[in-house]
A protein has these predicted regions:
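Bacterial N-terminal signal peptides
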Residues: 1-5
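Sec/Tat signal peptide C-region and signal peptidase I cleavage site
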Residues: 9-11
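Compact, glycine-rich, soluble single-domain proteins
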Residues: 13-158
Length: 158
């Protein structure tokens, strides 16, 4: 009985520390490969969008995004990658990274697009090879700016 009480307190403490345990759930894009990265010491679980179908879908349709979750879009070569907020249900930050994984452009607190025909396409003036979508406010909370190097761990997890 005492063991169960101690165990419950430990479990509750772990759940409160979202950086350790509270990913959306095993259902956070189960069909996607995943990777974990560290951004300024903060661990983030990323679903990898590496096919055209996955890149088109992005985070659309997801109900929410926890602070320690995001999506990494992988492209074969650097180019000007445009993104929009069609069918999104929450605001996000978008970071464009070059082939050296340095942030080259940031769009913050992008709101969902309500009217399909009026959706703005966000396209930086510089080429990028990777694009990160993270919870709105993440870039400010973790002091990310142009030139920040994101250590991408492209060894995939399932």
């Amino acid at each position: 009985m005492i063991f169960a009480i101690i165990s419950s307190k430990s479990y509750a403490s772990e759940l409160q520390d979202s950086n350790k345990t509270s990913y959306n759930s095993p259902d956070f894009y189960p069909q996607y490969k995943k990777t974990s990265i560290s951004i300024n010491g903060f661990k983030v679980l990323l679903a990898l969008a590496s096919t055209d179908e996955q890149r088109i879908k992005g985070l659309s349709g997801l109900e929410k995004l926890n602070e320690n979750e995001g999506m990494l879009f992988l492209f074969d070569r650097p180019s000007k990658q445009g993104f929009w907020m069609n069918e999104m249900k929450f605001p996000i930050d978008i970071l464009w990274l070059d082939s050296d994984s340095r942030v080259v452009h940031i769009e913050k607190n992008l709101e969902p697009c309500i009217i399909f025909m009026a959706c703005h396409v966000y396209t930086p003036q510089v080429d990028s090879q990777y694009v990160l979508e993270l919870r709105s406010g993440f870039t400010n909370d973790h002091s990310i700016q142009n030139g920040t190097r994101i250590n991408l761990n492209l060894t995939q997890e399932n």
